[in-house]
Design a protein with these regions (language model features):
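A conserved amphipathic terminal alpha-helix motif
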Residues: 100-131
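Residue-level detector of beta-strand structural context in well-folded domains
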Residues: 5-7, 34-35, 42, 53-54, ...
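A short gly/proline-enriched turn/hairpin at secondary-structure junctions
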Residues: 27-33, 40-41, 46-48, 69-70
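Hydrophobic pocket/interface hotspot
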Residues: 16-17, 26, 44, 55, ...
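Short, flexible helix/strand-to-coil boundary loops that buttress conserved ligand/catalytic motifs
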Residues: 20, 30, 59, 68, ...
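Structured surface interface patches that mediate subunit assembly and partner/cofactor docking
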Residues: 25-28, 39, 115, 130-131
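Hydrophobic-ligand binding "helix-grip"
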Residues: 45, 49-93, 99-101, 130
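Hydrophobic ligand-binding cavity/cleft-lining segments
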Residues: 1-35
């Protein structure tokens, strides 16, 4: 199974990357605890430990690839999440692609990317631009 979603975030790619690449920054936006993984190979957690994984690839201002799992998944089951950033008029196009999530989790994850990532980032950077 695969998921693909996108949005234009009203911020520069470096600003968006700064949130995606650091669970501390993501925690500040979501209000949920996390443990940062700031370099390739490092483990991270986000959303009060509901997502854990490892940073697979980190290309500043362009891409973050993570191996993800939820604690309720069978042991050893991970999916791969790609966050791709492209500068566009009005900010940064953020494309999120997730591959390999368990079929019974597809709808849950697909429904929550806007809540936990896309919508949150748009709201945060829109508020910063206005204020």
């Amino acid at each position: 199974m695969s998921i693909r979603q996108q949005a234009v975030i009203p911020a520069e790619p470096a600003q968006v990357y700064g949130v995606l690449a650091d669970a501390d920054a993501l925690s500040a936006l979501s209000g949920m605890s996390g443990r940062p993984g700031r370099v390739e190979g490092e483990e991270f957690s986000a959303f009060n430990g509901n997502v854990t994984g490892r940073q697979v690839e980190m290309v500043p201002d362009a891409r973050v690839v993570q191996a993800w799992r939820f604690p309720r998944w069978e042991a050893g089951v991970y999916s791969i999440v790609h966050f791709t950033l492209t500068a566009v008029d009005g900010g940064t196009r953020l494309v999120i692609e997730q591959h390999g999530e368990p079929q019974d989790w597809h709808d849950h994850i697909d429904a929550n990317f806007p809540t936990f990532y896309l919508g949150t980032l748009v709201e945060h950077f829109s508020a910063n631009a206005a204020g």
